[in-house]
C-alpha cells in the first residue's frame, strides 16, 4: 500500500509540475517575443528581453502554485490517479474471474 501511495504521489506531483512548467514556458515565450519586438522597435537594450522572460517565469510559477493551492488541483489529480488504479485492479480481477483464459489473453495489453 505504501509503494502504491508513493507512486500516486510521484505521478500526481510530477504531472502537475510538468503542466505548470509548460504553461509558464508558453507565457514566458510569448512575453519574450513581445519584449524582443519592443527592444528592436524602440532601441531598448536587448538584456531587457532576458529580464522580461525571467520575471514572467517567476510570476507565472508563483501564480500557478497559488491557483494549485487554492483549488487543490494536485490533490484532485492524485485522487483521480488513485481511483483509476483501483478501478483498473477491479477490472483485471473481473477479467480473471469471468473470462476464459483465451479471451483473457486477448484482452490483456502486452507487457513491454
Curated annotation (Swiss-Prot):
Residues exposed to the Periplasmic side: 43
Record keyword tRNA-binding present: no
Bilayer topology annotation: Multi-pass membrane protein
Localization: Cell inner membrane
Gene Ontology cellular component annotations, sorted alphabetically: plasma membrane
Cytoplasmic side: 1-21, 65-112
Major subcellular location class: membrane
Record-annotated membrane-spanning stretches: 22-42, 44-64
Keywords: Cell inner membrane, Cell membrane, Membrane, Transmembrane, Transmembrane helix
Record-given protein name: Putative inner membrane protein YafU
Gene that encodes the chain: yafU
Amino acid at each position: 500500500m505504501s509503494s502504491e501511495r508513493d507512486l500516486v504521489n510521484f505521478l500526481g506531483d510530477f504531472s502537475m509540475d510538468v503542466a505548470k512548467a509548460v504553461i509558464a514556458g508558453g507565457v514566458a515565450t510569448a512575453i519574450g517575443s513581445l519584449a524582443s519586438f519592443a527592444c528592436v522597435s524602440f532601441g531598448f537594450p536587448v538584456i531587457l528581453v532576458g529580464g522580461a522572460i525571467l520575471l514572467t517565469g517567476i510570476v507565472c510559477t508563483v501564480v500557478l502554485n497559488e491557483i494549485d493551492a487554492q483549488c487543490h488541483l494536485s490533490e484532485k489529480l492524485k485522487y483521480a490517479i488513485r481511483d483509476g488504479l483501483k478501478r483498473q485492479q477491479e477490472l483485471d480481477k473481473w477479467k480473471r474471474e469471468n473470462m476464459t483464459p483465451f479471451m483473457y489473453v486477448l484482452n490483456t495489453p502486452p507487457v513491454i
